[in-house]
Amino acid sequence: MNISILLPTRKRLDLLKKSVQSLIDNARQPDKLQFLFAVDEDDNKTFLYLKQSKYPNQLALQFKPIGYENLHKYNNTLAGYATGKWIMFFNDDAIMKTKNWDDKIMDFEDEFCLLRFKEQTGHPYSIFPCFPQKWFYLLDHISLHGQNDAWLSEIAYMLNIMRDVDISVIHDRADITGNNNDETFRLRKYNEGNPEQKGDLHHIDMVKLRYKDALKINWLLGLMGQPNEFIIKNLENKSDPFILLKEKFDVYKKAGAVGAGKQNARVTDQREIKVSYSNLSKD
């Protein structure tokens, strides 16, 4: 199996069909994809459909509804069933546009990194993260917070292992395109933007947990013959391990910071986190 696709979905069957079909139609080897779906128990329509659908190597799991703020729990569970060399997040409101996108991912097979697709907002995070299966095997989780893309991306920037890849995805989300302003979108809850509040993405406890993940991955990189001193040098020199992320956010801000519904973390130094919305502050 080449790529395992994690796809939590809630009461968006028509969107889900369109999203999955875009991945299949544009893949060179769709038979080497694995589709892993998470469906809430109160979304029987979607689950019944997936019970009879025949997507490549599919598995659908039912969950008690735990909300968007616990998206990581859906994804961490699905990842335990992943058999692909790469694990990838996708959304039911996302459309793959690039032909042979699966080949472009496999081109990175010899490198341990986080892949960042192109999407119309230009957000510095990898909005649809794609990473080696070993990432999950090492940590026994993908994220410990509902903002999965932010969790993974901040680790990747700390280690300088974020890699842009020429794969384009349309994120057809209400605050970006004006489409799909449904209940699923409106009821989303972000635990982000209040770093003094326990459970927030940038509460000190969460920051420390990401550092632990990053240092474990750094250890693995050395074992794999891909030594990486980026984070170690920054910590030893008491310099900013988030400098690469800050530079990306500067570009993002100048471009207009599209997608106001997405809260954007702005890291000021290795110990202090400031958060704003789409109008990122200078400091």
Over which residues does each language-model region extend?
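Glycine-rich, basic loop-to-helix element that forms the pyrophosphate-binding segment
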Residues: P65-A82
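Acidic donor-binding segment of Leloir-type glycosyltransferases
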Residues: L23-P65
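Short, well-formed alpha-helical segments that are part of the catalytic scaffolds
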Residues: R12-A27
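Cell-envelope/extracellular polymer assembly enzymes that use nucleotide-activated donors
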Residues: N2-S4, Q34
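C-terminal catalytic/acceptor-binding lobe
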Residues: A150-D283
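Conserved donor NDP-sugar-binding/catalytic core segment of glycosyltransferases
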Residues: I95, K99-Q133, D164
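Aromatic-glycine-rich donor-binding/catalytic loop that engages nucleotide-sugar donors
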Residues: F131-N148, I155-V165
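Short aromatic/hydrophobic "clamp" motif used to bind/position activated sugar donors
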Residues: I87
